[in-house]
Amino acid sequence: HHEIVQPVMDMIERSDGVVFSVSCFQGHLTGVMKNFTDHMAFMLHRPRYFHKKALIVCTTGGISASSTTKALAATLPGWGFNKCYQLPVTALSWNAYEPAGKDLRKAEKAARRFYLDVKSGRMHPPSIGVLIPFNLFQALCVGNAGEKEYPTEDNHFWPRYLGMQYAPG
């Protein structure tokens, strides 16, 4: 597990921003992307990408591009991502799609906003729905630093970051 996931985590860490290109399957993330988010689920307990921004792109030949981008955009702040931009595009043809002017303008607007935000280094305030679990995990685990009977990686992680803020700066 670690050998597969760590290189991806390292790439995210070295990046200024991350573009996720996701497919839609039955109105949601595909099994492959769901497997990836499952492998990264420990990040909800030990987030770290506080200065990272994400652009989530989904095209679908029908419906549900929005629900697909929203699903990933709901997960990434728990990993620490500071801001998630979404670009859902619905194609009118599965085989011969040519982007409409509206879709091109939408893509340019999303890309420009993402780029300017990454370039600015601006930190956006986190939502209360992100702050509550962040502070809860920190408070619960710091007191368990010396836990011998049921040691967890969380109990080793959080004492090193005692007092860490979700969105420093």
Model-derived features: positions:
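Glycine-rich phosphate/pyrophosphate-binding loop and the adjoining helix
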Residues: 82-169
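Helix-loop-strand module that forms the ligand-binding subsite of alpha/beta enzymes
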Residues: 2-82, 156-160, 164
